[in-house]
């Protein structure tokens, strides 16, 4: 599963995923089709891995899945049955904040029908509403 190799601080503040749109990482950059979030949420490392496995199984040996989000924030929790106080709990899971219009996954090198089906299967594993976006034709600079 995805998690940072090392971080400056083990325990972090909780970041809001408010109703603002993403102004970076909201276009198809590396592939031909992309899975774009239409709502905001926290997405855990397990959910990202589950979506990646679903997409790669549908694609078979051809094509490539590009993950555009990374779970770099830690979520802490205390064990069950522990009373309040005595500090913050230990890091339990890693998550990523996904705002509206964030491009989460991209695929390249396969037929359009297979690409859309693979992204659809991956999207059903995630806790956000999503849509499939096609890459805009690149303009050649002369």
From Swiss-Prot:
Q: Which GO terms describe its biological process?
A: translation
Recorded hits in InterPro entries, A to Z, give: Ribosomal_uL16, Ribosomal_uL16_bact-type, Ribosomal_uL16_CS, Ribosomal_uL16_dom, Ribosomal_uL16_sf
Family statement: Belongs to the universal ribosomal protein uL16 family.
PANTHER family registered for this protein in UniProt: 50S/60S RIBOSOMAL PROTEIN L16, LARGE RIBOSOMAL SUBUNIT PROTEIN UL16M
User: What SUPFAM superfamilies does UniProt report for this protein, alphabetically?
Assistant: Ribosomal protein L16p/L10e (SSF54686)
Q: What's this protein's function?
A: Binds 23S rRNA and is also seen to make contacts with the A and possibly P site tRNAs.
Q: What is the lineage of its organism?
A: Bacteria, Bacillati, Mycoplasmatota, Mycoplasmoidales, Metamycoplasmataceae
Which organism is this protein's natural source? Mycoplasmopsis pulmonis (strain UAB CTIP) (Mycoplasma pulmonis)
What are the annotated GO cellular component locations?
A: cytosolic large ribosomal subunit
What is the protein's name according to its record? Large ribosomal subunit protein uL16
Describe its partners and assembly state: Part of the 50S ribosomal subunit.
Q: Name one GO molecular function term.
A: tRNA binding
Q: Which UniProt keywords apply?
A: Ribonucleoprotein, Ribosomal protein, RNA-binding, rRNA-binding, tRNA-binding
* Gene from which the chain derives: rplP
- Pfam family, any one: Ribosomal_L16
């Amino acid at each position: 599963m995805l998690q940072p190799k090392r971080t400056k601080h083990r325990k972090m503040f909780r970041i809001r995923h408010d109703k603002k749109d993403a102004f970076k990482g909201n276009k198809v950059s590396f592939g031909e089709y992309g899975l774009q979030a239409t709502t905001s949420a926290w997405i855990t490392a397990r959910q990202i891995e589950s979506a990646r496995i679903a997409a790669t199984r549908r694609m078979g040996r051809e094509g490539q899945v590009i993950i555009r989000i990374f779970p770099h924030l830690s979520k802490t929790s205390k064990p069950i049955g522990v009373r309040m106080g005595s500090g913050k709990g230990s890091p339990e899971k890693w998550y990523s904040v996904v705002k509206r219009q964030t491009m989460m996954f991209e695929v390249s090198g396969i037929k359009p029908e297979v690409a859309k089906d693979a992204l659809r299967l991956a999207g059903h594993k995630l806790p956000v509403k999503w849509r499939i976006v096609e890459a805009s034709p690149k303009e050649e600079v002369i």
